Amino acid sequence: MSALGESNNKQNGKEILHNYVTKKLTSQPYSCQWIPTSCSVVTVGKKTSGGISKGDIKIHQLEFDDTSGDPKLNLVYENEFTNPFRCLSFFKQANQLQQQDNRKFITGDFNGQISEWDSDICDIPIWGVKGAHQGSISAIDAYADNLVVCGGKDGTIKVYDTRIKPNSANDNNGNNSSPISTFEQTNKSNCWSICTNDNNIIAGFENGDLNIYNLKTNSIQSTTKLNGGICSIDSNDRSNILNQFLITTNKSFISIASFNNNNNNNIEFKDYDINKEPNQTIWSGIYSPWNKKDNENIFTIAQGDGSVSMYRDDCKLIDKVLVSDLPILSLDYSKDRKGLLCCISLKKQLSILISPC
């Protein structure tokens, strides 16, 4: 395992990653993503009211103050729901920079329910499944316009097609909807992370298991074990997620992996130490959708010390910025405006970062 070098937050004397604006929230967000074709960010999480935990959805728009011209985050939507939310995903495309008309997103909550929302009018879900999992849904990923893959604390992974409407005629909350595929985990370890397209699923678990599933044959294609719980998985190519994917863990290391179906179904790993503390959690890692020329990949990670760090594909540190004094839980690149990232922290903060990469 390689160790990464120190950084002074500069590259050739210039700041690369900058904390542009931060706003304190009234609820604890657990996931954030940019709304396609907008300057708005949706956050989902938990809000405590009268000692009762409820679900919370907020939408903030990046704007500029009329007088000072300073950036600000303006709350344009907020609502409470019955169950606290754990995760969210917009529908990803094979070409991540392709203009997206689909502004719908999927949420997973702590009560095992998945719901589809229209980000323009998200007071009531337009589709959903109650009891998709027993207990919390820890990870969710959506692809194309209809494919939803979710993983839960119960150790199972389920695949849904939003074109299949609920059998119940009462509402769109899908009391009787069935998954099109289900994958069981023998040891029932919590599924923490999912990355999918219409061919494969890569799933990471709390106990370090990393499984690859084939959606065409509804079977497990490969399995291996890492020395740490797998917090997030992201691919540099959504059309072929197995070609190269980034794994972050709760043991202070990341791994850049690839799967060669012609190489005895083996997954090849390059592991890198990130933090000096041996058990610091790296909550999230994502590839930049913008920097693809000359086969150069750039990725950004959210760290347990409250910092956000940007790396080249060879794990050379580009820049690092301290955003909070508590862990960064989630981050996302804007697919419409190059250089914009959003992230949330355990300190109930939403931050917008800017970078030329």
From Swiss-Prot:
Record's protein name: Dynein axonemal assembly factor 10
Q: What subcellular compartments does it reside in?
A: Dynein axonemal particle
Cytoplasm as a keyword of this entry, yes or no, is: yes
Cross-referenced InterPro entries, in alphabetical order? Answer: WD40/YVTN_repeat-like_dom_sf, WD40_repeat_dom_sf, WD40_rpt
The record's note on quaternary structure and interaction partners says: Interacts with PIH1D1; the interaction associates DNAAF10 with the R2TP complex. Interacts with several dynein axonemal assembly factors.
Transmembrane spans = none
Question: Which Pfam families does the record cross-reference, listed alphabetically?
Answer: WD40
Reply yes or no: does the keyword Cytoplasm apply.
yes
Q: Name one GO cellular component term.
A: dynein axonemal particle
**WD repeat copies, ranges:** 80-127, 132-170, 184-223, 277-321
Entry GO MF terms: ubiquitin binding
Note the PANTHER family from the entry: MRNA EXPORT FACTOR AND BUB3 (PTHR10971)
Per UniProt, the keywords (alphabetical) are: Cytoplasm, Repeat, WD repeat
The gene is dnaaf10
Q: Give a short account of what the protein does.
A: Key assembly factor specifically required for the stability of axonemal dynein heavy chains in cytoplasm.
